[in-house]
Regions:
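Short proline/glycine-enriched turn/loop motifs at strand-loop junctions of beta-rich domains
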Residues: 40-45, 161
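Conserved Ser/Thr-centered positions that define the repeating blades of beta-propeller domains
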Residues: 49-51
Length: 345
């Protein structure tokens, strides 16, 4: 085995950008073992990934011991030990980087060296539509009647698609609000998004799509972890999770700067309206399983409110719709897919 020239240690928390949960301390190498020491400010599931020579980070490593895995309790000097370094493929490389992060079950994917994250949403049933008392202010007829919806498991983007990811796939940036690659892409129509999704699927081998309206609302509500909030993750403190008319300054903001909802999803309310796959139609009181919306229509659904929306426009049940060939500076989207299996054809 060639002598290790450098081992880089990267300790971050990818489960939340608004508050660090993992803090860096130190690492030591002795023989064939590596020991990482880190701090954790709250109980969490922890995993470790490795990147070889500046490449992509691997799926979580197995065979580790110490403060790793499920339900790690907080502490200032927690340790993780890898006893069999030579068994890591590529360990004889000149440079290794280790990533210690909150294990939120995310699928970490790349276009070139640009990472993006797809979050698992466990299937389940929920009540779709406006759950405010009937007749309450800012309740609209298109949000009722409420109805039971049952969904299979799926994945959804942790963030709105960024300008960096769009540019990596499409080679250009159509957005009005620029200056930071982490800004969500906007000024994209529903039809534009279909072209992007087809190209991204071809590049990565994964079958991406837009979420259905029901999938979007279930995820915004927090899925099976929902606490029954009116807005993503909150009941009244809209500013904690949503960029809207009173805190946005009249423009979009980089993704992931506010708090996430119960599923670890960011900006499900506010920032940009998000395209869904469905044509617009009125609700029915009938229970549905994996609804796809009507086969034809005039307008496509948008969800979540935007930076110019009032607070009630960012609720988990607020609906919007528009012609599929229009893209404005407050229209964006996030990705969805059925499974983590790649298309090998």
């Amino acid at each position: 085995m060639r002598r290790l020239v450098a081992i880089g240690l990267l300790l971050i928390c990818c489960a939340t950008l608004h508050a660090q949960q993992v803090t860096q301390h130190s690492f030591t190498v002795k023989g064939d073992s590596l020991t990482i020491t880190y701090g954790l400010d709250r109980q969490a599931d922890i995993c470790v990934r490795v990147a070889i020579d500046g490449g992509h980070f691997t799926p979580p490593l197995k065979g580790l011991e110490g403060a790793v895995g499920k339900g790690v309790k907080p502490g200032d000097s927690l340790t993780i030990t890898a006893f069999r370094l030579p068994e890591i493929q590529g360990i004889d490389s000149a440079s290794l980087s280790f990533l210690v992060e909150i294990d939120d079950g995310a699928l970490l994917l790349y276009v070139d060296n640009l990472p993006f994250r797809m979050m698992p949403v466990e299937g389940g049933s929920f009540t779709m539509g406006c759950t405010r008392p009937r007749g309450e202010k800012n309740t609209y007829s298109d949000e009722i009647p409420t109805h039971k919806v049952t969904l299979n498991s799926y994945y959804i983007g942790q963030y709105e698609v960024t300008q960096a990811l769009w540019t990596a796939v499409m080679g250009e940036n159509p957005s009005k609000w620029i200056g930071n690659d982490s800004l969500p892409v906007e000024q994209v129509s529903w039809n534009d998004v279909q072209i992007f999704i087809a190209r991204l699927s071809q590049i990565t081998g994964y079958r991406f799509r837009l979420p259905t309206e029901a999938e979007w609302e279930f995820a915004a509500r927090g899925g099976n972890r929902s606490r029954g909030m009116t807005y993503p993750g909150v009941n009244s403190q809209v500013w904690e999770t949503c960029w809207y008319v009173l805190n946005s300054g009249g423009r979009s903001h980089p993704v992931g700067r506010l708090k996430p909802n119960e599923l670890g999803l960011y900006d499900m309310g506010g920032n940009l309206l998000e395209w869904c796959s469905d044509w617009m139609e009125s609700y029915s009181a009938n229970a549905q399983t994996s609804p796809q919306g009507p086969r034809t229509g005039e307008n496509r659904i948008l969800r979540g409110g935007c930076f110019n929306s009032p607070s009630w426009g960012c609720s988990v049940f607020e609906r919007s719709w528009y012609l599929p060939d229009y893209g404005y500076s407050f229209f964006g989207f996030r990705l969805a897919m059925d499974s983590a299996e790649r298309d090998e054809e």
